[in-house]
């Protein structure tokens, strides 16, 4: 009877995926807090927006640079340990901010601690879980987890902004501390490193001879350590191997501008910019939440389009559309909502992470089996661009009293990204077998992506 009851229960992989989703959405939400802290910190401490934005930029850089090495840490120490420590770093960094009195403490807490913590829970975490626990429905799981990581911070914004508005920024920081700590028991109880740790095969896996199946679902400890060293070495050698490749620089340059024009500029400065024009902070944060909703739709649709159209043409269209939107934004900001602003939010949401599927596709065709590692560094350039925009836009606001130059500058750079995208080799020129291999690599290997 016990065996029959167990047979009716969902596979343990779905529990692992659910806990992973909660951790990813939470990590993205934790990274969203600085955008609603800018104004209250400025009011309380008298710090400039450029100074406060420097902490955000450190956070974004570390979030990106952690990605190529996060998989190695998970291989060496296990998923549960790495993610649990990452959540504790977030809780510690957020909790310590309530005692801060100087900007270096803000940079140390929200820049370094939260940046390292959330960076260890980027999409590399999702791809590792999906690759180990799923044979069937793997693509579906990766897609759902990607959406959670990419939109979690935008969905969290209205609630965090309301907390700051009603109870103060310290209360919001403490709520983040408690939330991050609360996820740790879920991770420790719900996640196992391999299906073999609980006597299971991956979801949808066919029965194999015991010895062969053991290697697939639970590699020996020595193999884990060896794979960790190989992963760390591959991350560094992968970068060195493409430094002279024009395709890499075109993709990295375009993704640098992608991060600059999303997470770094709009994600960090839209709320204070809208407040400059008289729009309440909670309302502005709610608009970013709407961006997050349409982000999900745009990402799924872009993946469908990438399978059917030239990825270069898609990127050219996405970046050009984004540039036009940013060029018009200074004319749309006002003290009240109107249809044109809502239209901007919807279109920008559809375009927010739509660049990811065609960028991954072009990485596959240009770099073959090296694509996962190369995309890790392309993603790092995305976060570097976000960091540059976070601090540069704050400096522009402090020097000119307005964000107008930042919007126009980003619009021009988006047009440059469209041009760079047109110079990358076309993924659809790759042979069919190669494309199939590329797809498998993209799913099995950890490919980080922005949480925009």
How should each PLM-predicted stretch be described?
Residues 145-198:
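Helix-loop-helix hairpin linking two adjacent transmembrane segments in secondary transporters
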Residues 34-38, 243-302, 389:
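Extracytoplasmic gate region of multi-pass secondary transporters
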Residues 66-79, 299-311, 397-398:
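Helix-to-loop junctions at the C-terminal end of transmembrane segments
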Residues 144, 153, 353, 366-402, ...:
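A late C-terminal transmembrane helix in Major Facilitator Superfamily
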Residues 41, 120-134, 354-367:
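Intracellular juxtamembrane helix-capping segments at the cytosolic ends
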Residues 88-101, 321-334:
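C-terminal ends and interior cores of transmembrane alpha-helices
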Residues 110-147:
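Cytoplasmic helix-loop-helix junction between adjacent transmembrane helices
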Residues 25, 93, 105-121, 256-257, ...:
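Hydrophobic core of transmembrane alpha-helices in multi-pass small-molecule transporters
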């Amino acid at each position: 009877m016990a065996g029959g009851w167990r047979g009716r229960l969902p596979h343990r992989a779905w529990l692992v995926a659910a806990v992973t989703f909660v951790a990813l959405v939470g990590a993205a939400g934790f990274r969203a807090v600085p955008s609603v802290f800018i104004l209250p910190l400025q009011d309380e401490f008298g710090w400039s927006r450029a100074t406060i934005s420097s902490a955000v930029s450190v956070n974004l850089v570390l979030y990106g640079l952690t990605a190529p090495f996060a998989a190695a840490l998970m291989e060496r120490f296990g998923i549960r340990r790495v993610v649990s420590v990452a959540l504790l770093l977030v809780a510690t960094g957020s909790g310590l901010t309530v005692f801060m009195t100087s900007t270096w403490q803000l940079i140390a807490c929200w820049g370094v601690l939260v940046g390292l913590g959330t960076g260890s829970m980027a999409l590399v975490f999702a791809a590792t879980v999906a690759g180990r626990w799923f044979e069937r429905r793997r693509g579906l799981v990766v897609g759902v987890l990607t959406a959670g990581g990419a939109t979690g911070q935008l969905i969290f914004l209205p609630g965090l902004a309301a907390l700051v508005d009603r109870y103060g920024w310290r209360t919001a920081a403490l709520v983040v501390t408690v939330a991050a700590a609360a996820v740790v028991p879920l991770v420790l109880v719900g996640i196992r490193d391999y299906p073999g740790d609980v006597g299971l095969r991956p979801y949808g896996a066919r029965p194999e001879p015991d010895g062969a199946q053991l290697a697939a679902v639970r590699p020996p400890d020595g193999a884990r350590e060896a794979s960790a060293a190989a992963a760390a070495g591959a991350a560094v050698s992968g970068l060195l191997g493409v430094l002279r490749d024009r395709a890499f620089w075109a993709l990295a340059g375009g993704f640098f501008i992608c991060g600059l024009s999303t997470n770094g500029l709009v994600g960090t400065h839209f709320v204070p910019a809208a407040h400059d024009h008289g729009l309440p902070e909670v309302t502005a944060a709610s608009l970013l939440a709407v961006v997050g909703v349409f982000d999900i739709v745009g990402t799924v649709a872009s993946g469908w389009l990438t399978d059917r159209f030239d990825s270069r043409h898609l990127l050219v269209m996405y970046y050009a559309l984004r540039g036009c939107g940013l060029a018009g934004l200074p004319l749309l900001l006002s003290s009240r909502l109107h249809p044109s602003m809502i239209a901007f939010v919807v279109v920008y949401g559809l375009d927010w992470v739509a660049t990811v599927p065609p960028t991954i596709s072009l990485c596959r065709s240009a770099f073959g089996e090296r694509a996962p590692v190369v995309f890790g560094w392309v993603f790092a350039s995305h976060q570097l661009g976000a960091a540059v925009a976070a601090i540069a836009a704050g400096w522009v606001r402090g020097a000119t009293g307005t964000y107008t130059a930042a919007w126009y500058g980003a619009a021009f750079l988006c047009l440059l990204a469209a041009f760079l995208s047109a110079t990358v080799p076309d993924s659809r020129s790759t042979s069919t077998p190669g494309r199939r291999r590329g797809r498998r690599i993209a799913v099995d290997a950890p490919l980080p992506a922005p949480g925009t």
